[in-house]
Amino acid sequence: MARVKRAVNAQKKRRTVLKASKGYRGQRSRLYRKAKEQQLHSLTYAYRDRRARKGEFRKLWISRINAAARANDITYNRLIQGLKAAGVEVDRKNLAEIAVSDAAAFTALVEVAKAALPEDVNAPSGEAA
């Protein structure tokens, strides 16, 4: 059987993995096998969390919009319902940015949404006759 000489390739592979695992704690940054295992886990977490980040930002935008809406005497779901009824097409990201940076413009959007809602929906819960 022919002898396989791959010392250079093996060292390069190990060096690449150890270089990528530089910030890990303990053996995970020094021993090849531990570093390789940790690198696989790290890449899995990164892949998962890139997708989770989108939902987390949406939650943040909704929280900001809801807080600003309640300051203007309307709830988040009524605000969104009113904006859709009025034909205002602004996404939650931009709506949250407006709520944080430009209160006057957000108040104007709230008034548009309130005007587009049916009258019985404008009444606080429990008082609609």
Swiss-Prot record:
GO MF, one example: rRNA binding
Record InterPro entries: Ribosomal_bL20, RIBOSOMAL_L20_CS, Ribosomal_protein_bL20_C
UniProt entry keywords in alphabetical sequence: Ribonucleoprotein, Ribosomal protein, RNA-binding, rRNA-binding
Record-linked SUPFAM superfamilies: Ribosomal protein L20
GO biological process, one term: translation
Gene Ontology cellular-component annotations: ribonucleoprotein complex; ribosome
Transmembrane parts of this sequence: none
The keyword Cell inner membrane belongs to this UniProt entry's keyword annotation: no
Gene3D superfamilies in UniProt: 6.10.160.10, Ribosomal protein L20 (1.10.1900.20)
CDD domains, per the entry: Ribosomal_L20
Role noted for this protein: Binds directly to 23S ribosomal RNA and is necessary for the in vitro assembly process of the 50S ribosomal subunit. It is not involved in the protein synthesizing functions of that subunit.
Family: Belongs to the bacterial ribosomal protein bL20 family.
Protein name: Large ribosomal subunit protein bL20
Record lineage: Bacteria, Bacillati, Actinomycetota, Actinomycetes, Mycobacteriales
